[in-house]
């Protein structure tokens, strides 16, 4: 008997909703990346997208540990000489809270074609409302919240 290898169409995808209120950003990103990648399933295969859809709500109420709001920076470069921009995570969180959460999660996914395909299953919203109620997402609770 040969070993079973799951194909792309063999997996059934679930929808999970995660409330990010008072959850530390890194802990949220780890759990979301596991769900997106499919590592919680016994049929996990590294070269197949077998993960689930993840909806994150209340991204604007995320928590950061320590002094990261002022001392951690997000860098971007325009491509021109002297075009390096440096913004504190606190400023970025105030303007674009969804972008901070998306960048934290996508940094934990593979940086390949498969990783870009997995990123499409991540939906992040700043407020408590999301348009995916028809998919009947299951609430996923993260046990560790900010102190």
Curated annotation (Swiss-Prot):
One GO CC annotation, please? cytosolic large ribosomal subunit
Q: Which molecular function terms from Gene Ontology are attached? A: mRNA binding; structural constituent of ribosome
Task: Read off the NCBIfam families from this record.
Answer: rplM_bact
Q: Does the keyword Ribonucleoprotein apply?
A: yes
**InterPro entries under this entry?**
Ribosomal_uL13 (IPR005822), Ribosomal_uL13_bac-type (IPR005823), Ribosomal_uL13_sf (IPR036899)
Gene Ontology biological-process annotations? negative regulation of translation; translation
User: What is the documented function of this protein?
Assistant: This protein is one of the early assembly proteins of the 50S ribosomal subunit, although it is not seen to bind rRNA by itself. It is important during the early stages of 50S assembly.
Subunit comment: Part of the 50S ribosomal subunit.
Annotated family: Belongs to the universal ribosomal protein uL13 family.
UniProt key word Ribosomal protein: yes
Source domain of life? Bacteria
- Which key words are in the record? Ribonucleoprotein, Ribosomal protein
Protein name according to UniProt: Large ribosomal subunit protein uL13
């Amino acid at each position: 008997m040969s070993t079973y290898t799951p194909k792309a169409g063999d997996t059934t995808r679930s929808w999970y909703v995660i409330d990010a209120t008072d959850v530390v950003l890194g802990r949220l990103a780890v759990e979301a990346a596991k769900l997106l990648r499919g590592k919680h399933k016994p049929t996990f295969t590294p070269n197949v997208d077998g993960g689930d859809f993840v909806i994150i709500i209340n991204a604007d109420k995320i928590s950061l540990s320590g002094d990261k709001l002022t001392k951690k920076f997000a860098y971007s470069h325009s491509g021109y000489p002297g075009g390096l921009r440096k913004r504190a995570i606190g400023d970025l969180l105030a303007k674009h809270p969804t972008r901070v959460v998306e960048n934290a999660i996508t940094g934990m996914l593979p940086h390949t074609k498969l990783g870009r395909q997995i990123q499409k299953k991540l939906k992040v919203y700043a407020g408590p409302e999301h348009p995916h109620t028809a998919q009947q997402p299951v609430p996923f609770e993260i046990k560790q919240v900010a102190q």
